[in-house]
């Protein structure tokens, strides 16, 4: 059962990432990988909420492991950061990598606080 939940959540998460990433890339054409940045930060906030919500195992498996596991993307983050360095966009690369890490941690903590404020935990 858990494999099916991860697969279903993963399908929804990857489609959501694809659609949002595409829309952001079409709207904002910059050298900065804004789509992946937005997706990973919002994913960190959502994971903070979900991991603090006290969900029963199947719901967490569907949303946390499945949906958010596929929604966020570490491999694309690394690929884009590396390409920025190779393209001599060193300032953008540093801003992207450090900004993603710092805002990811802050976003996760913010999600935990949101869960507390709405009395999920």
Predicted feature locations:
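Membrane-interface helix-loop junctions in multi-pass transporters/channels
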Residues: 1-121
């Amino acid at each position: 059962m858990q494999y099916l939940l991860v697969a279903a959540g993963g399908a929804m998460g990857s489609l959501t990432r694809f659609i949002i990433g595409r829309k952001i890339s079409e709207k904002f054409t910059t050298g900065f990988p804004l789509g992946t940045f937005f997706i990973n930060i919002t994913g960190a906030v959502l994971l903070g909420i979900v991991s603090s919500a006290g969900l029963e195992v199947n719901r967490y498996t569907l949303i946390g492991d499945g949906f958010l596991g596929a929604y966020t993307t570490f491999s694309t983050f690394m690929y884009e950061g590396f390409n920025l360095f190779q393209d001599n966009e060193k300032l953008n690369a540093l801003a992207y990598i450090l900004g993603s890490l710092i805002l990811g941690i802050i976003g996760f903590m913010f999600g935990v606080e949101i869960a507390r404020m709405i009395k999920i935990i």
